[in-house]
């Protein structure tokens, strides 16, 4: 199942759906909206994750041009989707927009997501 993320338009809560049973996800009394990757009007080269795998470690850099990591504009988290599941790492202003994930033997990367506090979700 492709990883899907949802946001509450009222409070800003974001969730990752683990299993889709067809029932809408509700927050603040209303259905949450699915976040569709890459739909914000922003620089692709600073938002799309760039990843490599070396010796079972997935190295992710956000953007082919490094994304800013300022308090007012930064990557909040990076999520890795694999054949066997998913992992997520949080980032904070002042840090480099880079993370690493370990893969178990036989697992493979399916997608990498990055969430920008201003420009929403991006996928590679």
Tell where the protein language model's regions lie, with residue ranges.
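Flanking scaffold residues of small Cys/His-coordinated metal-binding clusters
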Residues: 3, 19-22
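Residues immediately within or flanking Cys/His clusters that coordinate Zn2+
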Residues: 5, 24, 113
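Cys/His-rich microdomains that often coordinate metals
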Residues: 15, 31-32, 120
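Cysteine-rich micro-motifs
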Residues: 21-32
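Exposed aromatic-hydrophobic patches
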Residues: 61-62, 98-105
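Short acidic/polar inter-strand loop motif in beta-rich domains
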Residues: 117-124
